[in-house]
UniProtKB/Swiss-Prot annotation:
Chain positions with 4-hydroxyproline modification: 18, 21, 24, 33, 36, 39, 54, 69, 75, 84, 90, 117, 138, 147, 150, 177, 180, 192, 198, 207, 213, 216, 231, 240, 243, 255, 264, 279, 285, 294, 300, 314, 323, 329, 335, 344, 347, 356, 365, 371, 383, 392, 401, 404, 422, 439, 445, 451, 458, 464, 476, 485, 497, 503, 509, 518, 536, 551, 557, 578, 584, 587, 596, 602, 620, 629, 638, 650, 656, 665, 674, 677, 693, 703, 712, 730, 739, 742, 748, 763, 769, 775, 784, 790, 810, 813, 816, 871, 874, 892, 907, 913, 926, 929, 932, 935, 938
Ranges of biased composition (kind: Gly residues): 289-298
Pfam family, one: Collagen
Residues recorded with modification Phosphoserine: 99, 566
Record-given protein name: Collagen alpha-1(I) chain
Residue ranges, annotated region (Disordered): 1-938
InterPro entries referenced in this protein's UniProt entry, alphabetically: Collagen, Collagen_superfamily
Bias kind Pro residues: ranges: 137-149, 619-631, 762-772, 807-822, 923-938
3-hydroxyproline PTM positions: 664, 912, 925, 928, 931
Positions with biased composition (Low complexity): 26-45, 107-135, 183-222, 338-364, 373-392, 563-577, 590-617, 646-662, 843-867, 874-907
Domain of life: Eukaryota
Residues bearing PTM 5-hydroxylysine: 93, 234, 309, 530, 641, 799
PTM entry text: Contains mostly 4-hydroxyproline. Proline residues at the third position of the tripeptide repeating unit (G-X-Y) are hydroxylated in some or all of the chains.
Amino acid sequence: GGISVPGPMGPSGPRGLPGPPGAPGPQGFQGPPGEPGEPGASGPMGPRGPPGPPGKNGDDGEAGKPGRPGERGPPGPQGARGLPGTAGLPGMKGHRGFSGLDGAKGDAGPAGPKGRPGASGPAGARGNDGATGAAGPPGPTGPAGPPGFPGAVGAKGEAGPQGARGSEGPQGVRGEPGPPGPAGAAGPAGNPGADGQPGAKGANGAPGIAGAPGFPGARGPSGPQGPSGPPGPKGNSGEPGAPGNKGDTGAKGEPGPTGIQGPPGPAGEEGKRGARGEPGPTGLPGPPGERGGPGSRGFPGADGVAGPKERGSPGPAGPKGSPGEAGRPGEAGLPGAKGLTGSPGSPGPDGKTGPPGPAGQDGRPGPPGPPGARGQAGVMGFPGPKGAAGEPGKAGERGVPGPPGAVGPAGKDGEAGAQGPPGPAGPAGERGEQGPAGPGFQGLPGPAGPPGGEQGVPGDLGAPGPSGARGERGFPGERGVQGPPGPAGPRGSNGAPGSQGAPGLQGMPGERGAAGLPGPKGDRGDAGPKGADGAPGKDGVRGLTGPIGPPGPAGAPGDKGESGPSGPAGPTGARGAPGDRGEPGPPGPAGFAGPPGADGQPGAKGEPGDAGAKGDAGPPGPAGPTGPPGPIGNVGAPGPKGARGSAGPPGATGFPGAAGRVGPPGPSGNAGPPGPPGPVGKEGGETGPAGRPGEVGPPGGSPGADGPAGAPGTPGPQGISGQRGVVGLPGQRGERGFPGLPGPSGEPGKQGPSGSSGERGPPGPMGPPGLAGPPGESGREGAPGAEGSPGRDGSPGPKGDRGETGPGPPGAPGAPGAPGPVGPAGKNGDRGETGPAGPAGPAGPAGARGPAGPQGPRRGFSGLQGPAGPPGSPGEQGPSGASGPAGPRGPPGSAGSPGKDGLNGLPGPIGPPGPRTGDAGPVGPPGPPGPPGPPGPP
């Protein structure tokens, strides 16, 4: 065999026609959860939701334990001076005083002349008794002297010392506390406390797994309302907020009436002996003593010598007489001056805590306080799982295409994200049937006709037409006149309840307002989500039972009683007329991307669209196998950039190449700028046969929440103050009664107002793709969604022509050749080496901003994921067209078969703590009268 020398490269053949679209690739694996994104900025505060249903009254708390004795209060003010006491009883007889000392002996007088003894004189009178003194010891007996002259009356003796004061009696024991006095009047209500500190902000939870975004499906007609699902699990309780500041102390209440005096206490122990009292006043003189009897006659004396008549000295003192009898007790003296106030005694031991008194009556509500300040906006909660797609609605009329808008600025190429590992393959959904195409232009809405007949069986599915050759890009048409808005579609079925949002920060608790008159009963709204259970209240202290007053004026309706058992479902009400279209709401937060939908039927071939904007640069593919080394040529000088040649004739179909290795899925690029509006599509097909009527749906959902509260009424007149009644014994708590019988079914209610957004349910079944409507105006720019999972690998495109080496002259535009026969689909060729990135094109001029489009729906409907088309050649960066007017809604597509239930989303993070006290609920109807209480004690 000879050596094969490579010959020169032949000319490039004509470019082949694009092959038919390849079969849909296998379901892509779901990637692992991405890195948690940066927390978004807090969005604007949404409108205040309707008031929730009033909570049930909690059961009475257990009686609180008796409190500890309070601290000793400051000493009270000095009491008023007491009245003079009654005259005391006469004192006890004093003890006998001690014997007085003997008196001093007097000086002897001068001796008198001795007289002759005269006749015996009469006996002298007996002197007065001296002061009563104790008998002294007898003195020595002197010699008997001659009888002296009668002595003079002795001077009055001094009063003896007063007896010592008796010891004070023991202090009495502290008496038992008397019964509690009546409760004093309630003091005025204290000022409201200051605002509490806002609770700590809850941590942002990690976003859920991002699914691949589906294409929006057409909205179908509203189906019957499904039964309400079971209530969801109870959410975790929020963390308690920081404690609030202590409120100002209320004004001091008026003192209560004086309590009844308690019984006297038992006798106390004997006290210590008191100090000696001061001497009392001098007593009155006693009565004169009895006169003594005559003395014995003396002996005659001897005759004395007459001397000078001098007075003789007195004789020696005679013996002291015996003490006289004790005198009568003196009269009671005047009451002495009031002594100084004694210091307060030490506090006695605390008495035992008495049993708790009966509960007091509730006080009258105070005047309404000023409205509380609005709390801070709560942290925006994470978007809940994607809701189920609604059934397709009726399509509106097709508008006339508008003129092209101004050229917008060219978008920058986004950076390629990190490549994630492939996830497990998800289950493929069931494929729905494709209905026939709808009619052409829709007329103005006519009057509502009678209910139609039975729905016909859907027609057979037509075979898809052959794929036509791709036409050249046409010039954008002129912007047509905006068509009239289409008729409002029927109200869609109620979505599944959405996930509970994060509770807002704690607001200032408002004061309790005055009870208003009941407002008119509002229409019955949809049932709102069940609120979180409130924190258990603190055990209150049971107060004293107040007096029973006369019946006052009719009060405001009481709180709503506990809900009884659900009655039997009533008949389905007549469907109300569709309500007026509401104002467009603010754009909602971007929801999580849903899971990839099931592969749908291939749709009908659409009109050739304009070339899209240049996509982002794809990730570099894996290196292909190294080819044989070619001959080394001379390096030529770079030639000038040639003009873009026109498309050449299609070349012959080449042999299918060898199957290449499937590379790993590349990361999703950033979304490019919107392309110009496409041309108006063809009119739809003929109207399909009417379908058969559906089965009767399940009974409607649970009754909605009460309507809004009525306007506050004027306060009623002040009731007459009642007399104080006898304190009754607290009655025993009655047992809970049996639930009442269910009431009769009511008439169908009026169409209620739109309910608040429910919790977002699991993704519903995917409907078939509807007809493509004209492009609408650009809505507001939404928040960037989560990064989608890697898309499926598209079918490989036809092998491109091999370019000539070296710079060639610009070729003349050739005539378009006839389309060649469609060759068989080629096998995947080896992936070529990644070429260098081209230079970035110049940025286009900034286009004028188009008119603001109408507010889009809060949530788009997840469409079916179509089969991946062959990759087209990258087009040049086209100018961004202006947003076209919103086209009318197209005719409704046929209902698709129900899809499989989606997977439940991950639980959201625990939100920040909610307010401790919620807004006051609407005033409920008056409850039934309670049973009479037990009679009080007589």
